[in-house]
Amino acid sequence: MKIIRKSILAVLVFTILCGIIYPVSTTVLAQVLFKEEANGSIIEVDGKKYGSELLGQQFTDNKYLWGRIMNINVEMFKDSNGKPLMYSSPSNLSPASEEYEKLVKERVERIRSYNKGKEEEPIPVDLVTSSGSGLDPHISVAAAKYQVDRIAKERNLSVDYVNEIIDKYTTGRFLGIFGEKTVNVLKVNLALDGILRE
């Protein structure tokens, strides 16, 4: 009987600790210290929500900055109203497999075909490979700059203006030394459309 009482007490203590105290305290801390991130970092302009600055979106139109490759075809996973149910997933292909090599070669050819005049330039790796999650919101500065001529031509803008927007939404290295500078794809595209004006 003593063991049963101790077991029930342990269940109650851990239920209160793990089911109430821990979730409430982490939620309160997140709302106090990281309010924007805890609420999804949603980009909202004039009451309209355009997406999260922490999640990648697929842009395929030539007038937009393209992000990293997404592994799921959004068109395949829509509800009855046409709303996407799934945007991406990780790739399970081994980097050493022939199938992966073929896939990357196809992506390289596609990128080259849309970015004329850059045949001799190496394509930044993040334009032809996907990330672990498949939802990276950022690309490297090199990947963004590689696309400037195409975007400027499609939108009838100056290369300098497109570069200016890319520079505006480029973030530095973490703590100034880790990683590399990155460009937020959604923010650049919203700025190109004249929606985001910071």
Curated annotation (Swiss-Prot):
The chain crosses the membrane at residues 8-28. Keywords: ATP-binding, Cell membrane, Ion transport, Membrane, Nucleotide-binding, Potassium, Potassium transport, Transmembrane, Transmembrane helix, Transport. It is a single-pass membrane protein. It comes from the Bacteria. GO terms for molecular function: ATP binding; P-type potassium transmembrane transporter activity. One of its GO terms (cellular component) is plasma membrane. InterPro entries: KdpC. It is found in: Cell membrane. The keyword Coiled coil does not apply. Belongs to the KdpC family. Part of the high-affinity ATP-driven potassium transport (or Kdp) system, which catalyzes the hydrolysis of ATP coupled with the electrogenic transport of potassium into the cytoplasm. This subunit acts as a catalytic chaperone that increases the ATP-binding affinity of the ATP-hydrolyzing subunit KdpB by the formation of a transient KdpB/KdpC/ATP ternary complex. The system is composed of three essential subunits: KdpA, KdpB and KdpC. PANTHER family: POTASSIUM-TRANSPORTING ATPASE C CHAIN (PTHR30042), POTASSIUM-TRANSPORTING ATPASE KDPC SUBUNIT (PTHR30042:SF2). NCBIfam families: kdpC, PRK00315.1. This is Potassium-transporting ATPase KdpC subunit. It comes from Clostridium perfringens (strain ATCC 13124 / DSM 756 / JCM 1290 / NCIMB 6125 / NCTC 8237 / Type A).
